[in-house]
């Protein structure tokens, strides 16, 4: 497992469980300063250098991030770090579909991402595509963990980007609503959220509001009745539980969201979402079938089957991956690895 962010642990652990269950081995390589070794469990193996990674001789490297070095062994399988939330890259294209020439296989989540990736595979011809579902969601569908709340519970999640985040805009409104005590608030932000905003929300902690720092958002998703969000892809994970989301200034609002552009509308929008009208519920269900139709908790097994297929010489791309000289140099410099 090649990771560079703390949220990767929760994405890959269902895959780790499936690998270990069939008697195979797993090791972790942590790249950069934004991923904490403290999140590793006692029984998890860490490889501390690129030399150790290559000595390990992995058959498959699973990556939830966007890039992976070409100079480590194993076929490279992209499993994504979230859903396509419509975020655009610097060139104005949807970042979810940015082909960087690093992967042999993309394991897609559902029809609305599989079809574009199949088109891209036909265009580039140096990677394969298999629809598997997203392993990160496997624990989400453990119905025994779904909470029965005595008080309506609102989960607020926000991305860190200044252009997209709802956190600074909604602070005063969330403060006022939490002081009312009508709902229970859970606040969880992207790990890159500016410290000053984190401290602001931590100052609101009370019987009605908890600020939670975690590498695993799934228990929070299971606990909440409604999510308040912006353009963070975590909102799509919440929708998979067939629960409503209120978004603030979403860059690509859809009919399965309750989107607002005025913070004064937050309270009434949450009330509307809590009532979960049939029309909204139908739209959410259509979104689920198009985005991630699997609710069996077995996406990890499907990812492994897709990797096995590639290792067996099936579903192989027609061409080799591009040379990517500049990207290769950047990765070697980043990891300070110059061996051939």
Task: Report the location of each language-model feature.
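C-terminal amphipathic helix plus adjacent low-complexity
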Residues: 268, 274-340
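A donor-sugar binding/catalytic signature common to diverse glycosyltransferases
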Residues: 67, 72-78, 214-257
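Active-site and donor-binding regions of nucleotide-sugar-utilizing enzymes
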Residues: 1-141
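Conserved catalytic-core segment of nucleotide-activated headgroup transferases in glycan assembly
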Residues: 8-20, 129-201, 295, 299-301
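Short acidic-hydrophobic, aromatic-tinged amphipathic segments that line or gate anion-handling sites
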Residues: 45-51, 209-214, 257-272
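Donor nucleotide-activated moiety binding/catalytic core segment of transferases
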Residues: 48-54, 193-240
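Catalytic binding pocket for nucleotide-activated donors in carbohydrate/polymer assembly enzymes
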Residues: 100, 124-126, 233-295
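Short, polar loop motifs at secondary-structure junctions
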Residues: 31-36, 62-69, 191-194, 231-235, ...
């Amino acid at each position: 497992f090649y990771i560079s962010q703390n949220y990767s642990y929760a994405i890959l652990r269902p895959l780790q469980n499936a690998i270990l269950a069939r008697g195979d081995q797993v090791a972790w390589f942590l790249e950069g300063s934004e991923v904490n070794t403290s999140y590793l469990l006692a029984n998890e193996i860490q490889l501390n250098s690129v030399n150790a990674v290559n000595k390990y001789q992995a058959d498959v490297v699973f990556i939830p991030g966007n890039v992976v070095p070409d100079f480590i062994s194993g076929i490279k399988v992209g499993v994504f770090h979230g859903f396509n939330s419509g975020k655009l890259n610097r060139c104005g294209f949807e970042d979810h579909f940015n082909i960087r020439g690093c992967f042999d296989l993309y394991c897609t989540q559902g029809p609305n991402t599989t079809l574009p990736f199949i088109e891209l595979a036909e265009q580039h011809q140096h990677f394969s595509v298999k629809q598997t579902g997203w392993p990160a969601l496997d624990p989400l569908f453990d119905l025994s963990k779904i909470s029965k709340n005595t008080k309506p519970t609102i989960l607020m999640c926000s991305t860190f980007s200044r252009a997209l985040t709802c956190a600074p805009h909604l602070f005063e409104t969330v403060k006022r609503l939490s002081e009312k005590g009508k709902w229970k608030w859970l606040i969880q932000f992207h790990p890159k959220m500016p410290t000053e905003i984190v401290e602001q929300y931590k100052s609101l902690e009370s019987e009605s509001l908890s600020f939670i720092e975690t590498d695993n958002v799934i228990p929070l998703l299971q606990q909440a009745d409604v999510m308040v969000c912006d353009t963070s892809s975590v909102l799509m994970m919440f929708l998979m539980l067939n629960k409503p989301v209120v978004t603030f200034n979403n860059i690509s609002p859809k009919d399965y969201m309750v989107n607002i552009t005025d913070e004064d509308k937050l309270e009434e929008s949450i009330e509307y979402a809590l009532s979960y009208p049939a029309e909204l519920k139908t739209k959410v269900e259509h979104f689920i079938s198009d985005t991630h139709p699997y609710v069996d908790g077995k996406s990890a097994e499907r990812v492994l089957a897709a990797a096995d297929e590639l290792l067996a010489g099936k579903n192989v791309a027609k061409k080799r991956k591009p040379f990517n000289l500049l990207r290769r140099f950047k990765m070697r410099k980043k990891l300070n690895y110059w061996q051939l």
